Amino acid sequence: MFTTVLSEIRQNRNRPLFVLVADYIDGDTLDDVFSWRKELREVGQGESFDVLVHSPGGQLTACFMIARLLCRFTGRWEALVPQIAGSGATMICLGSSNIVMSEISQLGPLDPQVASKKREKFFATERQSPLEAFEALRYLREFAVASLDALMEVLTDRGIAPQKALETSVEIATNLVKPVLEKIDPYDLGAFSLDNKLAINYCKEVARPPDPNRKTQRKAFYKSLVEDYPVHEFAIDFGEAQAINLAVSQPPVDLEVVFDKFRVIASKIKSYVGLVPAPPDGGSQ
């Protein structure tokens, strides 16, 4: 049933179709894609081919390498996203000339999921996001300033001299946030910052390669994918994708019908990587 739906998508688009379905993109996924290099080079000699991407994301470097490989095989390819291409899978789509996505489809921010380097971790769970650490610091800063302002107002209203009121307010506001700040390791924050910079550089390399003949998402605001969204789970739908200047289009009605079929069965498929065979009647290669 799954391969039948993939064949329908290929026939509808009338061009070669490479499929990348993974519940988590890692080094093994990269190896699977690389194993198709001969076939991808052959189809890449044509005008264009499609890559169907269905994944919530995965390892940053593995996703980057997959994106670079796809762009080496052809100067132009289009991404098909029937449902989800989140996080690192979104970065892969930056290598496309266009992303075909439904109203229900979603991309996602590139929020690197990293591990704390210290034994006693700041986060209780294994999943650790730089956004969470930076948001915690932002909240503490805003809380400290708000507390300082409120204390100054109370103390000056009670007739305390401004200098003394300021000293007292600073001391109280500092003591309020100090217990939390002491649990944040600057080393972790530095590591998180480096991971964010790595994500931005990877996005730039994929979206804006040195070769001007490669048709990629050159106009996309790729930094927004790393810096501008509040949480890792933020859904970048069709409208939001347009807002960050991604080249996107919606599928025609007949292709949307096939996408509907794909979404019904996609949750049952953990991994599928490879080219969809050409139709037996000798259709498009």
What residue spans do the PLM features occupy?
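Terminal-region recognition feature
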Residues: 1-285
